[in-house]
Amino acid sequence: MGISRRPKGNNNASAAESAPSGKPNIQKAQFDTTKKKEVGVSDLTLISKVSNEAINENLKKRFDNREIYTYIGHVLVSVNPFRDLGIYTDAVLDSYKGKNRLEMPPHVFAVAESAYYNMNGYKDNQCVIISGESGAGKTEAAKRIMQYIANVSGGSNSSIQEIKDMVLATNPLLESFGNAKTLRNNNSSRFGKYLQLQFNAQGEPVGADITNYLLEKTRVVTQIKDERNFHIFYQFTKGASQAYRENFGIQQPSQYLYTSKAGCFDVDGIDDLAEYQDTLNAMKIIGLSQAEQDEIFRMLAAILWTGNIQFREDEDGYAAVVDQSVVDFLAYLLDCDAGHVIQAITIRILTPRNGEVIESPANVPQALATRDALAKAIYNNLFDWIVERVNKSLTARSATSNSIGILDIYGFEIFEKNSFEQLCINYVNEKLQQIFIQLTLKTEQEEYAREQIQWTPIKYFDNKIVCDLIESMRPPGIFSAMKDATKTAHADPAACDRTFMQAISGMSNPHLTPRQGNFIVKHYAGDVSYTVEGITDKNKDQLLKGLLNLFGQSKNQFIHELFPHQVDQDNRKQPPSAGDKIKASANDLVATLMKATPSYIRTIKPNENKSPTEYNEKNVLHQVKYLGLQENVRIRRAGFAYRQTFDKFVERFYLLSPKTSYAGDYIWTGDSKTGAMQILKDTNIPVEEYQMGVTKAFIKAPETLFALEHMRDRYWHNMAARIQRVWRAFLQIRIEAATRIQRMFRKKREGKEFLELREKGHQVLQGRKERRRYSLLGSRRFMGDYLGIAATTGPGSKIRGSINLPANEATIFSCRGEILETKFGRSSKLSPRIFIMTKAKFYIVSQQLVNKQVQIAVEKAIPLGAIKFVSISTCRDDWFSLGVGSPQEADPLLTCVFKTELFTHMQGAMPGGGFNLKIGDSIEYAKKPNKMQLIKVVKDSQQAQDHYKSATIHTQAGEPPTSRSKPLPKGKPVAPKPFTSGRLIKPGGPGGRPSKLTNGNRPTPKPVPSPAAARPVPTPAAAAMPIPAPIPAANPIAASIPVHTRNPSLQSAQSTRAVPPPPPPAPPAPPPAPASKEPQYRVLYEFAGQSANEFSLKQGEIVTVLQKETNGWWLTKNVRGQGWAPTAYLEEVAPPPPPPIASRPTPPPPPGPPKMNGANGAAVRSKPTPPAPPAKRPVAGRKPAPPPAPRDSGMSISSNGSGNNSGRSTPTPSLAGGLAEALRARQSAMQGNAKKEDEDDW
């Protein structure tokens, strides 16, 4: 499909950028006051030296400058700022919509935009893996991703908006039940969460699903000093309603053992009361009924009261309850018998291998352990129920097409005492690190080798050996050893621990070191020492049968939902251990993540004090090392940013090549690999930017991929623009055709009204008054309001405002005229006036000059009904009188060139039709009140105009009184104006080809300059005559109003020709050749590039610097290619001095006076000869230098000497470009005038 030419004047910058061969539409640069200067590098792949220390230094620079995000290719590194930087506002969010990651600074919104765009564009499931240690900001990053996707995913449907609100409401709800304050983080996630957002084919969210992992249920019963239990307990005890306090016995957190044991009740930056309200609001949004909320808080109260049960030793050494009332209230909350509660806690049911059931009284430590197990079981199952209930509300409303997963799981943990919980957490983090290695390091390099891509292998640490150490079955790993030890000595926890330690000591693994009472595992994040004591008992994860019996005896239906399984007293089969469960969950999570396209966010904790200004370089360096950022940078710098199979690549980008697509249809008949190569060729992608593998196409730089995506996005816009352009042209043609028809119709209709009014004028005069020849012209029309008094703008509106003409009086006639003023002791005198007639009155308006300012005032306002008669003569004069008969004032005697039209309008506006027109040999009027006088009108052929003297008016003889107006003259025939000229359709036509009807596109032959010897010498032109300056008007209003006077009869002034101006000065010397804008540098030392993007240099050669960076590397270029080179190896070469400028020739002497030709006195001079072109043609692409003294002489080079240009002078073209340039300028001016004439209406 051919590229259509856009019409002129369409400033579509994006379309211009999308055309590979088009010139970019560069807009005016503006200073951006919001953009900060970049500190360090925003992408670590651009760092000058690849090392852990250099990465740490760059992160520190950016952290100190409030820049917390940095890229490693498509991986985002985030440093926790421990403060609000104001970078998550709606304005910031909107700025990342539809932008690729290179268009905007690094941000978590850019990762979310990329995941959402790729899901819609490629129809692949996406996932965002957020990793890092506890307190590094993983939960905050997950919330911001959810915020962005909910904002950009669109959808105005109420169900879609409901899903968005529910997804966002899961954050405060699950945080209150699953987060807690630790020594390292005030809002630490004590559970893992994988949120999967489900979308339909249009990219709208229709559902979601949450999977939780590894809830730290031991925190319910014990916390170390200065830590807290889960947030919900403090929210509930501080903010519970009065009904909850009365029904559930809720008191302050200091009254419960589980919330007061660590001695921390309040946390800086956390408002428990406000967050409690947020939790209740989230429950309502998700759809939890009030009954369900009541049951949830009943279980929380039961857990709190369970912790307050205390035991003492009885006389037999067994456990006995200290306060029976606490047990009674707990039984009330669990809706069961208090005796069953005491029996479940103080009596242990054992089932040996022989099948005998033994009930053994528990001592105080055993009873406390059973009590805590009861509380942990209730909270763990309550949390699972809440997650299931949320998933029920988030069930997909319609069919799902793709999904975006967000993994937020607590990070790597190392404490002074690490047990089973830390082993499980660190194991899951090892699995996530293994995914990262598999997808970014190992799999990538294996794929390069498999696809036969040129590649230099990079060494990295594969943590699979650590994962096998923990989860392997053969040879037995740590989880298998725990399970075997439990089978061997399941009744004695201490014996189980000893058996497990013996198994650990027998293992042979370089990443495992046994010690006395503990063992050390060398994780990817560091060495961790795990305590063996109690580790096997935690691995059992068994709820005692006595507690299960207690839950079964409860009458509360909600408890049966929390513990749905019935107790089988005869089942002695060992249930799955906690290690088995977490291993199965971790493997399921890995399988889910491997099915999606991952995006990575690596979070870093800058210090252990939660300080917004402290940056602990030692701790951050450790995190940089175990996160493998250095290896990631090396692979990203040498790798390929994008790879796709040939089939999918062609399916995605076939629109970009005319050989693979036509009008959106796929027309390629060859194989996919050849088609992919054809697409890259037609889009002008350099061969260095991609490689073709066996089954996939590999693109090196992400900028190349973004360019392809941009061109694909603009394809449909460009096609739509073509259709719209043709459709708009068609509509414009119809509109223009209709406009022409309407214009002609209105012209005929309005002209008919004016002609009818003119015919009425003949009837008003009754055929008794001689007519002026100009009054009978066929083009004469009765326009009425000649001064524009009824207009809203212009000088007429200013007159209307000056005389305060009422808005309800419509002006039907206005013009300028004169009135005869009679003064005592002096002869009568004509004075100018303004006549305005409305449907009610006739106004005589005077203008007087007071203090050099014109004052406009109403001199007389005569009601039309007060006019008894109008007196005129039978001659062709313009005089008439208004017979008012006022006893105080004389009748006005007026003269007006539009008298007949005035009488016609007056007859139509006169109330009751009482218009009395007296026509006689003299004009009758009251010169003084009640004193009539006659003004004689005589014919005098010597008077060119009407002349008044001594009560007599002298005028010439006119046309016969019975004369009629001549017919309307026919217009001058003109050729019909085509629709493809002027502004209707731009040059190029709607189809992109030159229009056949326009003359502007015809090729013009270029003038060939003649030899210098054959060129005639130009003749000096006559000097221009000085033009007197016009006299300024006294007032702009008066100057802008037309004066209605008769032209001198049969007299005309002889037109004089304007004297042509002198020739322009001699052209200046041609400008020197432009120096190179790009600086040149000489190579001082030999430099051998170490990577693909480093440019090898040879000593002494000259290179051009294309881009300068502050990190010590510049982008250089020469004939061999381009690449990055160290700045210390280069020295700038001074540019050569410009050549000397030749002196300008002396201008010619002033010309003499022009020769006069005979009687008419017209100036005659010979035809000027074009001046000689400059000696050297100006450099292409540069403007010719203008003459030193610009003048507007009003002449053209091809002029014939006439200066009459109807008031418009053509600007003098510059002669510095020679004859050819002058002729081209003249031709452009002529074409411009012709175009303007074509655009004029009929």
Swiss-Prot record:
Gene3D superfamilies: 1.10.10.820, 1.20.5.4820, 1.20.58.530, Kinesin motor domain, Myosin VI head, motor domain, U50 subdomain, SH3 Domains. SUPFAM superfamilies: P-loop containing nucleoside triphosphate hydrolases (SSF52540), SH3-domain (SSF50044). Residues 1047-1057 have a biased composition (Polar residues). Residues 586-608 are annotated as: Actin-binding. It comes from the Eukaryota. Residues 1076-1135 form the SH3 domain. Residues 771-961 form the TH1 domain. It is found in: Cytoplasm, Cytoskeleton, Actin patch. Pfam families: Myo1_CA (PF22773), Myosin_head (PF00063), Myosin_TH1 (PF06017), SH3_1 (PF00018). GO terms for biological process: actin cortical patch assembly; actin cortical patch localization; actin filament organization; endocytosis; mitotic cytokinesis. Keywords: Actin-binding, ATP-binding, Cytoplasm, Cytoskeleton, Hydrolase, Motor protein, Myosin, Nucleotide-binding, Repeat, SH3 domain. One of its GO terms (molecular function) is ATP binding. Residues 39-713 form the Myosin motor domain. Residues 717-737, 738-763 form the IQ domain. Residues 10-21, 1011-1020, 1191-1226 have a biased composition (Low complexity). Residues 1-26, 945-1020, 1047-1082, 1130-1242 are annotated as: Disordered. ATP binds at G132, E133, S134, G135, A136, G137, K138, T139. One of its GO terms (cellular component) is myosin I complex. Belongs to the TRAFAC class myosin-kinesin ATPase superfamily. Myosin family. This is Myosin-1. It comes from Botryotinia fuckeliana (strain B05.10).
